[in-house]
Amino acid sequence: EEYAQANAVIAPPKAWGKAVPFGWNSWGALQFNLTYPKALEVSDFYKENLQSHHFVNSDNLVYTGLDSGWNSFSEEALKAFVDKCKANGQVAGVYWTPFTDWAKNPEREIKEMPGYKYKDVYLYANGKPQELDGAYAVDPTHPAIEAMMKHTSELFHRAGFEYVKMDF
């Protein structure tokens, strides 16, 4: 929280001038069982059964979002999901937590910055990684995390996502 507040002093948050994002996020039903075919099926279900019955926000939009498991999709599959959502009149979204290590595997290499392992980027207190809600916190200012954030943000942009939800 303190890191976010300090950043807000330097770069205030952008105002959201649109209606509340409303729709579906894969975590609620699929959790760790998200697959590409299931994501497409949900987009089609919303299009065929719900959108025409006013299951939209005040901007007449539905947000269809991928949660945990999107990283098992190829870049081509992510783009195809976005294209499917657009064709179905939806805004494609994705959820990402770049400031945590859910695997809690200190020896795992950070693929976007070879030579660094997750133990190099953990936030420590009294020599122990700091854990919250089942994940280890990572240093958002570490060059390896910055490289990971740049790489993943560019992937989302190339795939065409219009909505990215991030948690600290």
Residue ranges and their predicted role:
Residues 2-12, 42, 51, 75-80, ...:
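Alpha-helical scaffolding within the catalytic cores
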